[in-house]
Amino acid sequence: MRYNERELLSLSRQPAEKAAEILMRVPKKGSVLKKRLVKLVVNFLFYFRTDEAEPIGALLLEHCRITKEEENVFSISFIEEPERKYCFECDSEEQCQEWIEALKRASYEFMRRSLIFYRNEIQKMTGKDPLEQFGISEEARFQLASHKQ
């Protein structure tokens, strides 16, 4: 997927949901762990050299797996390219778990499923569809796959 470089640069400058300097290894042969500033903004994980303001890369956190590896280490791999695996080593196990949880919550699919879940809970409690007032209650993106019309 291609992105507009200026838009990505602008997005990388937005406030981060989570940011830290951690060790990172990219999926290149012979790659070693390097200290990077890693910044989660919406569903993008930007990574920077620690002394630079512009990102050197960005990962779109869709269709990916966030996996706990050994102690203090997690990885991100992509479902359609499992060999493309990024590894991150945190300072502590607690920091590692916080990153894993934040990254799993960052995807559009997670947000969509959460919206559907809470929509159904509100509907059970009130008897009303909370999206109806916005005229979007029948849109496919707000339906579970089995309920799409």
From Swiss-Prot:
PROSITE patterns: PH_DOMAIN (PS50003). It comes from the Eukaryota. GO terms for cellular component: cytosol; early endosome; recycling endosome; trans-Golgi network. InterPro entries: Boi1/Boi2-like, PH-like_dom_sf, PH_domain. Pfam families: PH. Residues 15-108 form the PH domain. GO terms for biological process: endosome organization; receptor recycling; retrograde transport, endosome to Golgi. This is Pleckstrin homology domain-containing family J member 1. It comes from Gallus gallus. The lineage of its organism: Eukaryota, Metazoa, Chordata, Craniata, Vertebrata.
